[in-house]
């Protein structure tokens, strides 16, 4: 059953791992959010050019265009949505990833994450 109050909020999931994208889509849709998935940052750019999203859930490491490049593009072209980004990343954080996350001040989820962790963080934003 969908949760009331989230029907008008749209979320773009930017994730190259199909299973994770589907999991996030299922959880967020169940809570009443309108959800779309982009398989990489380049596809996300195209979707952001055509549509409006209230929040982005962005994987840091992806082929074609990763989350770091997408975030830099957002800051230049879509600063409003750049403020409402949650990053996801694998459990092994290299120094470069830690530096990036620290510089953005954005929240992030370590994979694998639970549905409760995902919804809890989304609702905070």
Region spans (language model):
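Charged docking surfaces used in two-component/phosphorelay signaling
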Residues: 19-30
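Active-site residues of response regulator receiver
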Residues: 59
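Alpha4 helix (beta4-alpha4-beta5 surface) of REC/receiver domains from two-component response regulators
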Residues: 69, 91-110, 116, 120
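Acidic catalytic/metal-coordinating carboxylates
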Residues: 39-43, 66-72
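Receiver (REC) domain active-site loop signature in two-component systems and cognate sites
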Residues: 62
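Conserved acidic carboxylate
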Residues: 15
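Non-catalytic signal-transmission and effector/linker regions of two-component phosphorelay proteins
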Residues: 1-10, 114-125
């Amino acid at each position: 059953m969908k949760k009331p109050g989230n029907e008008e909020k749209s979320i773009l999931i930017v994730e190259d791992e199909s299973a994770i994208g589907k999991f996030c889509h299922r959880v967020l849709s169940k809570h009443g959010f309108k959800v779309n998935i982009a398989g990489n940052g380049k596809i996300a750019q195209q979707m952001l050019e055509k549509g409006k999203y209230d929040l982005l859930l962005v994987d840091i490491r992806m082929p074609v265009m990763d989350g770091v490049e997408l975030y830099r593009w957002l800051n230049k072209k879509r600063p409003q949505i750049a403020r409402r980004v949650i990053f996801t990343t694998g459990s092994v954080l290299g120094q470069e990833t830690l530096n990036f996350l620290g510089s953005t001040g954005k929240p992030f989820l370590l994979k694998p994450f639970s549905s409760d962790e995902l919804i809890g963080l989304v609702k905070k934003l």
